[in-house]
From Swiss-Prot:
Gene name of the encoded protein: RAB2A
Main location: endoplasmic reticulum
UniProt record, GO biological process: protein transport; vesicle-mediated transport
Main function: Protein transport. Probably involved in vesicular traffic.
Pfam family, one: Ras
Protein name in UniProt: Ras-related protein Rab-2-A
Amino acid sequence: MSYAYLFKYIIIGDTGVGKSCLLLQFTDKRFQPVHDLTIGVEFGARMITIDNKPIKLQIWDTAGQESFRSITRSYYRGAAGALLVYDITRRETFNHLASWLEDARQHANANMTIMLVGNKCDLSHRRAVSYEEGEQFAKEHGLIFMEASAKTAQNVEEAFVKTAGAIYKKIQDGVFDVSNESYGIKVGYVVPGQSGGAGSSSQGGGCCS
């Protein structure tokens, strides 16, 4: 299928926060409760629509283990967007965000759009990180923020699409040189009369049970 633009994403965060589950829910619309630990990098892709233009998202899901951090770092280069994920029921995954963000800022292009995702909001009764804390961290570091649930699919679509919307706006504002593919953006072509796949510019929001 043709596309107007291709955006490359990377999903980062600690082991077990649900990175692979978020990707699977977005690309296949299904939840797999038992998922093998990601070894190295996994890959997914999906078409969405932004401003009536078909956009292809290529998404790299990275391993959270420290031993794979050097592999992960190589994927920062050439990514237009990142989903930085923590688990709202595990405080330590939130505490490690600063380290992940430092890594991303050091190895990625300066204009990469980063979406902070507090995953597993369906388990709000086991919450260890408040919504306000996530929101404050995002505000302090210039990130977009959303809580989501890979299990119920709440805000999963929105997290990926809203990130794409921010990247698209940067293209419109002239922030990116789209002829330089190191920014994680590739200009495609569109067959007349063809629109994109599922998805559209969606409104963000909190996570409701």
